[in-house]
Amino acid sequence: MDAEAWLASEKRLIDNEEWTPPAEREKKAAASAITVEEYTKKWIAERDLAGGTKDLYSTHARKRIYPVLGDTPVAEMTPALVRAWWAGMGKQYPTARRHAYNVLRAVMNTAVEDKLVSENPCRIEQKAPAERDVEALTPEELDVVAGEVFEHYRVAVYILAWTSLRFGELIEIRRKDIMDDGETMKLRVRRGPARVGEKIVVGNTKTVRSKRPVTVPPHVAAMIRAHMADRTKMNKGPEALLVTTTRGQRLSKSAFTRSLKKGYAKIGRPDLRIHDLRAVGATLAAQAGATTKELMVRLGHTTPRMAMKYQMASAARDEEIARRMSELAGITP
């Protein structure tokens, strides 16, 4: 472009009130050319996330976003492109599909803030996944389940069910995290392991609220003390893990699941999962009188909805409520 043409172009921009410094225009042009893959990688790198979460986001992006949308300039993303991508993923893996969409939507929210696009093209209305209708275990059923679990780490069943710790939180509890004056025992949840690639990396807990002390019910505290006193189950020293394999290594979720499934089968509940023990704890705490706020603190949740989500229905509890309602009416069943 010669000087006269350049001046004419600049004058046009001024007349249309669109003029900005050339350097700024060049920077904006370069930014608008950044692709979805480049921007997503930058977005993940800049987020203050736990290592495991970053790895999970990267996996969803690598497997489901980059192959289709990776080469598309962020500035050219449209609702039509997103709808086509969403439909192309199919319905075989709904959870992975939903997570990939949530990553892309979060990335595009930041792109709006960065003024790369005027609005977020991710506008698909997702149906919330159906809540699992699971009946809570009774303490008696819990004893049967625990009785079928490998004795070396049987105490884990009771800890998960009565304290509502996440499995990842439990397997990082060390001797130094156990506060016990002989009467009251608290477990300080401060770290959590996560799989990053082929390695297990210990980092922050799932959320800031997840860092918390959890008071252990006295009967479970007694079990933990007995477990800690058994040198075949727990090593000495402040760094010793509370729950381990027979070789003293960190207990894996797969190994614990295999053992736990035997217990679930024993009571005719093969549908249950490890995480359901956390829900049992929330239900038992609520039945013991915990308020929603107290449940939020105990479970390490940031919203009442999440705390309520973990409470299960109990047929026996429903019968007890019905009896108490009659008592309020002055009638003794």
From Swiss-Prot:
- In this protein, the active site sits at R166, K206, H275, R278, H301, Y310
Arranged from A to Z, the UniProt key words for this protein are: DNA integration, DNA recombination, DNA-binding, Hydrolase, Transferase, Viral genome integration, Virus entry into host cell
| One of the Pfam families matching this protein, by short name | Phage_integrase
Q: What is its EC number?
A: 2.7.7.-, 3.1.-.-
User: Which residue numbers delimit the Core-binding (CB) domain?
Assistant: 34-112
Tyr recombinase domain sequence ranges: 132-323
Question: Its function?
Answer: Integrase is necessary for integration of the phage into the host genome by site-specific recombination.
The protein in question is named Integrase
As recorded in Swiss-Prot or TrEMBL, the protein's gene is named int
